[in-house]
Amino acid sequence: MGIRQAAIKILFLICISITSLAASQPLLNSEDIHRVMDRLFSLHIENRELSPTIIRRCFKLYIEQFDSEKSYLLEREVLPYLQISDEAAFAVIERMNNNDFSDFLMLNDMIQRAIARAQNMRHSNTIQMLDNDWPGAASPSAIQSHFAYSEKELADRLKNRLIRFYMFHKTRTDLSSTERKEKIVSLFDKKLRRQENNYLFLKANGAKMERKQIEHYFALRILKAFAKSLDTHSSFFSPEEAHEMRMSLEKQFEGVGVILFEGVDGVMISEVVKGGPAEQSGMIQTNDLLVEIDGNVLEFLAFEEVLDLLKKDNRREVVLGLRRIDDEGNPSFFHVTLNKRPIMLNESRISTSFEKFGDGVIGKISLYSFYESNDGISSEKDIKDAIRSFQKIGPLYGLVLDLRENSGGFLSQAVKVSGLFLSNGVVVISKYGRGEIHYLRNIVGRSFFNGPLVVLTSKMSASAAEIVAQALQDYGVAIIVGDERTFGKGSIQYQTVTDEGADIFFKVTVGKYYTASGRTTQIEGVKADIVVPTYYAPYNIGERYLEYPLSPDRLDPAFIDPLTDLDAKTKRLFQDKYMPYLQRVVSFWKKVLPVLRKNSTQRLAQNPQFQKMLRHQEQIRGRLEFLPPNSVDEMPATANDYQMEEAVNIVLDMIYLEQQSRVESAQAEEQLTGS
């Protein structure tokens, strides 16, 4: 669940696959709707068939897919769908079972009329605004608690969107002249029409789609609304979306290594990916204007058409034409020839550093997701390599594992990463819709690191990150430090996204996971042993703020592995080779936790900058009504990482307390021997 919402700026990582997705994937049709629905119902943890509740959710989500800011549709237009009676909903179900999706066609017709109305309003608004002083006042938020009651209210909301858009770009480029203002209005309209054209069944260039394309996009929107109506984490994806997700999970893609942004002057280079062909050419910089691709002038092309040109799969070489303005305002034009190749996204995988301590170090590892690929890249391997690199410097006396920005990834990697700090034992218990229970185990009889360990978490730590944090907390081998709780995603999804041979792409919630204590992280998240608030602490972030989340429950503990999911032969093998070496629950850190908390509280109370941050967070809490759930303000740049500093201090306390305990144990043993 990348989870932080972007405000206006949308970045596109140009990932060019060898095989064109559009060409290789068949278009959807109405018959696929039933096929996909049946598949998802057969897998889902709770929902097995269409119901009035599912229908109401479908209509609501279909509407919100189009009008999330409530700036197109009137309340009187949407209420018949949002408040549909059970009787009417059963009639919709009967029609859908007969392959009749006319209810959604009528809803789409209503959306098309709303688009025409909005385009007329935008035209009137922009003429008026261009003739007067800019920009006027805008409300601080895009959140609307209700759909507009009147067309005047709609017009005001559209005007407000334009003003916010203008103010966003004004901080990034010169908009003083009438010509520049006209350009920003044109860009605003272009971005809205990009979404509107999908519902008007128009191509990027404004031409009407072919019938098969119309049927495809209509079916795609229904399936997206349907999948999301099952629960908050079930989703249906287009092939393009699935491809992007797969690259995100595998931390690699094939391309030229540029990130594009559509700005006032055209398509800009927003970022050059480290280690990619663009960076290695030494010729491309951020803010360069992309004006040509393989000799094709881009000036009059829609942004999607620019992306399509880059994604063409019939050549390995791409020639980019770029324009650059120097510090004196002088333009220059140049060409760069780049060869597409695989690029590893190393920056978003892991980062490491250390603090010197005596003759050794305290290691710091920040892990941003749980990933693995066919090329041997994995989060487990990267952490092992980091620990080895620390040990080459000197003894590794303690470790901080930072999962504050980690929103999950592969479950198998969560088990393996947990296993680096545990011996044999159950890491995750998974329970599925029909009651089946499975145990995911670490079967390596010796931990890779067993010293003082702090796991840093935040409200943004989710899914696989929560498994690792709670598993290590259950066994008592780590102290959890950070926000009061983590995100709270404790559900399991089956997905076809990583299956390149799949003809449809979805993820569907099939179960919930629990750790060895029998606790689930669903809704409640992982509770910190020592609360050190992060930047995210004051915001409304978490599973509890999503629509249609599953409820939490509890299973019996599995610290003593029951082996009930194994066949007789495997069970005998595990009883001989695995059970004698089970990880024991460590009680020492729990015993000294009051001391660790007291020391931490005293340090933070004496840190004026940390106290200043806490006061600022109180101000943020006072304006949460203007922010949608699961979103945050842009994080300010700061040189101080108070949570990491305190995590290291807690590790230092742990080292001292552990050494003190050993001394006391040795003294007690000597006294016993002497007596």
Predicted region positions:
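Acidic/histidine-rich, surface-exposed loop or edge segments in extracytoplasmic proteins
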Residues: 33-45, 87-89, 197-201, 367-369, ...
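Cleft-lining beta-strand/loop regions that shape enzyme active-site pockets
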Residues: 41-51, 209-216, 231-253, 262, ...
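Extended, domain-scale alpha-helical bundle/helix-rich regions
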Residues: 123-253, 264
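PDZ/PDZ-like domain segments forming the peptide/carboxylate-binding groove
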Residues: 48, 64-65, 100, 104-120, ...
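Bacterial N-terminal signal peptides
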Residues: 9-19
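Conserved functional hotspot residues or short segments at active or partner-binding sites
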Residues: 134, 139-140, 144, 164-196, ...
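Bacterial N-terminal signal peptides that target proteins for export
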Residues: 1-11
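Polar, glycine-rich mid-to-C-terminal structural blocks
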Residues: 464, 476, 483, 487-539
